[in-house]
């Protein structure tokens, strides 16, 4: 996959943020995300032109079955009528977006994530002494290279690769500042399985946004992901298509002093 990021001003391009986080641990799958279409903004632009008049289809390539997506005004996203087809570990998926006579496509797989085994408050601090520690743990998948994205809310993210704990239990801490959480707050921590291409892409986005990049953020950059224009290749789109298995844990912040 070609991944390029530049902060230079450029001709507006279609931005395809096709991000599907599927929470599979409950009684039935639950989707966060969808397809958001817009035009790219230059560095100092505040307004992001949205696109609603496109045709969007996802194909389950093993079966060849097509699933159209429909625009939701309330969500600002193109969404499928069902998400059951998105959780096949053995199939590739193709998304096709048609807009203004141009056809854009991208492919991905459903990437699994280990469940969050532990999410509890600790009593360690960092620099100021008033940080709140959250201790997390999961069991890495054996015999494969894995990449994960942890979402701590408030546009706080941590990409993780399993290079140094392949197939092992991994325990780590995240520290919230006193400006980010307070006693009594309910926090939600989410884990997503991602591909190596998206892991690299997301790290580039973080480097351009002072660590505050995130899904559907209006990025002041030309961020080329895994989508291509098959009608006019030089008029390539920006953005990324991925489908991730996701898990989450919630906990209330307590006063441990």
Kindly label every feature range from the protein language model.
Residues 1-257:
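A sequence/structural signal for flexible, mid-protein segments enriched
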């Amino acid at each position: 996959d070609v991944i390029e990021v530049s902060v230079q001003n450029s001709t507006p391009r279609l931005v395809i943020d096709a991000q599907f986080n599927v929470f599979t641990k409950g009684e039935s799958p639950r989707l966060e995300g969808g397809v958001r279409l817009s035009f790219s903004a230059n560095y100092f632009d505040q307004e992001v032109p949205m696109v609603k008049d496109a045709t969007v289809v996802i194909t389950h390539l093993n079966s060849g079955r097509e699933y159209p997506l429909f625009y939701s005004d309330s969500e600002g996203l193109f969404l499928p009528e069902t998400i059951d087809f998105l959780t096949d570990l053995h199939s590739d998926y193709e998304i096709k977006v048609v807009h203004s006579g141009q056809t854009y496509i991208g492919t991905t797989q459903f990437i699994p994530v280990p469940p969050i085994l532990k999410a509890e408050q600790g009593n360690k601090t960092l620099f100021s002494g008033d940080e709140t520690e959250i201790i997390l743990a999961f069991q890495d998948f054996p015999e494969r290279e894995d990449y994960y994205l942890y979402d701590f809310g408030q546009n706080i993210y941590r990409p993780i690769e399993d290079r140094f704990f392949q197939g092992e239990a991994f325990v780590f801490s995240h520290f919230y500042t006193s400006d980010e959480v307070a006693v009594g707050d309910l926090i939600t921590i989410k884990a997503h399985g991602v591909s190596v291409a998206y892991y690299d892409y997301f790290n580039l986005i973080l480097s351009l946004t002072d660590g505050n990049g995130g899904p559907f953020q209006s990025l002041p950059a030309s961020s080329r992901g895994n989508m291509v224009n098959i009608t006019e290749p030089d008029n390539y789109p920006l953005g990324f298509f991925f489908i991730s298995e996701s898990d989450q844990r919630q906990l209330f912040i307590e006063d441990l002093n």
